[in-house]
């Protein structure tokens, strides 16, 4: 009996000691990196910047040459007035409910969720007036000084809390390539842009976050912008547009669809397809704290902004997009 008591005492000490050690480790983790002391909360004060302190961006990376495709196509898909939200990620975690661990907002296909298939997307209703059944989605933006009260505002968990800000506008746009004509995207091509784990990854190779203010279109930042009164907060998410010609998806979700290199030239072995660009705008009162939904360990870093799409246009719809881009016209659908 004495030995059993001594063993029980030892176990209790180990458990308590382990808990203390865990607390020390967690405290050390929360005090490291560029967001000291924030643990898994965030964002940090340094995640915000006055847009006036952001230098103007350089001009376009490359002017469209004589062999390029200078057109543009705007697809009218509304601004998620249907309140299509979920915690799924069809591109990254197909078949896994709540696999995103944060909330996504959608335009386009109204049936899109983790369980969607090519066939279900092809049959789904859409918010796009021209009949595009593609799904376009991104993590929601929240006001953290106001509690979320609706079910879709409280379902994500994992530290994602606050009132979801509705998009004041959503622009779905396709652009061409500055040095080449584009070829059609294949049906059900999956694509993603940005790095949802940018805070912990450290390296910035996949970071594509572009935050800004509507009154300063020449300034963009990877931090949350403080905008002048009357301006909208903007997010611009440009997707890779060089397809390997074979696959609609890939392990890691990037190798089949890559970004152009310098001057807009696609990497060897890839072909230029229409470049998708999403531009989101929000009404944010001056000084209101905002945070993009994220994995808990990413601390709502603005650098983690990202978006995904699945192309469900018909071959005819995509052909019209390609023709508009390659002939240098500005079209709407």
Map each language-model feature to its residues.
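Secretory targeting and sorting signals
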Residues: 2-32
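Primary mode marks residue(s) on the alpha4-beta5-alpha5 output face of response regulator receiver
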Residues: 33-101, 105-237, 244-333
């Amino acid at each position: 009996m004495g030995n059993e008591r001594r063993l029980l005492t030892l176990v209790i000490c180990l458990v308590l000691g382990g808990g203390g050690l865990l607390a020390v480790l967690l405290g050390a983790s929360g005090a490291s990196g560029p967001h000291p002391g924030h643990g898994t909360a965030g964002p940090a004060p340094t995640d915000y910047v006055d847009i006036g302190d952001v230098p103007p961006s350089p001009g376009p990376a490359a002017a469209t040459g004589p062999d390029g495709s200078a057109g543009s196509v705007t697809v009218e898909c509304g601004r998620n007035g249907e309140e299509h939200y979920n915690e799924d990620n069809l591109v990254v975690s197909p078949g896994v409910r709540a696999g995103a661990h944060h909330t996504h907002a959608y335009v386009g296909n109204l049936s899109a969720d983790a369980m969607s298939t090519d066939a279900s997307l092809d049959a789904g209703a859409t918010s796009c007036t021209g009949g595009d059944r593609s799904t376009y989605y991104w993590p929601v933006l929240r006001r953290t000084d106001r509690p979320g009260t609706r079910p879709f505002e409280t379902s994500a968990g994992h530290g994602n809390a606050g009132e979801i800000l509705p998009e004041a506008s959503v622009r779905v746009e396709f652009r061409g390539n500055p040095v080449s004509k584009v070829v059609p995207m294949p049906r059900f091509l999956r694509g993603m842009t940005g790095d949802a784990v940018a805070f912990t990854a450290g390296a910035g190779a996949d970071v594509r976050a572009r935050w800004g203010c509507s009154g300063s279109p020449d300034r963009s930042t990877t931090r949350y912008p403080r905008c002048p009164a009357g301006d909208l907060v903007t997010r611009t998410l440009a997707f890779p547009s060089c397809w390997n010609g074979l696959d609609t998806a890939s392990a890691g979700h990037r190798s089949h669809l890559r970004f152009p290199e310098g001057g807009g030239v696609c990497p060897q072995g890839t072909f230029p397809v229409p470049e998708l660009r999403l531009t989101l705008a929000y009404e944010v009162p001056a000084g209101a704290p905002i945070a993009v939904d994220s994995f808990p360990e990413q601390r709502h870093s603005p650098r983690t902004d990202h978006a995904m799409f699945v192309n469900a246009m018909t071959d005819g719809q995509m052909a019209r997009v390609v023709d508009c881009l390659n002939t240098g016209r500005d079209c709407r659908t």
